[in-house]
Amino acid sequence: MVSIRLTFALAIVAIIFAFSVDAAYKKPPFNGSIFGKRSNTMTDYEFTSRALSAICEVASETCTAWMSRQESN
């Protein structure tokens, strides 16, 4: 009889803990969960894009200057 009561009490406690853990879970906001956060701050890919754009511009100017110098010789 005691073991049945103990088992029943432990089952009740386990169910209460299961509901309390479930209640602590909070879903992320839909706006940022799938599509990313929409803000005015620059993201990493924007910095990378600007850096690559600057490198390509410098390389293009250097190659143009070098090729025009090669043609004049």
UniProtKB/Swiss-Prot annotation:
Sorted keywords for this record are: Amidation, Neuropeptide, Secreted, Signal
Q: What is its main location?
A: secreted
Residues recorded as bearing Phenylalanine amide in the entry: F35
Q: Where is the signal peptide?
A: 1-23
* Propeptide feature: residues: 39-73
- The organism is Camponotus floridanus (Florida carpenter ant)
Secreted listed as a keyword: yes
Q: What protein family does this chain belong to? A: Belongs to the FARP (FMRFamide related peptide) family.
Please give an example of a GO cellular component term from this record. Answer: extracellular region
Query: Which terms under GO biological process does the entry name?
Result: neuropeptide signaling pathway
Q: What is this protein called?
A: SIFamide-related peptide
Q: What does the entry state regarding organ or tissue expression?
A: Expressed in brain, the retrocerebral complex and in ventral, thoracic and abdominal ganglia (at protein level).
**Superkingdom per UniProt:** Eukaryota
Q: Where is this chain's protein located in or outside the cell?
A: Secreted
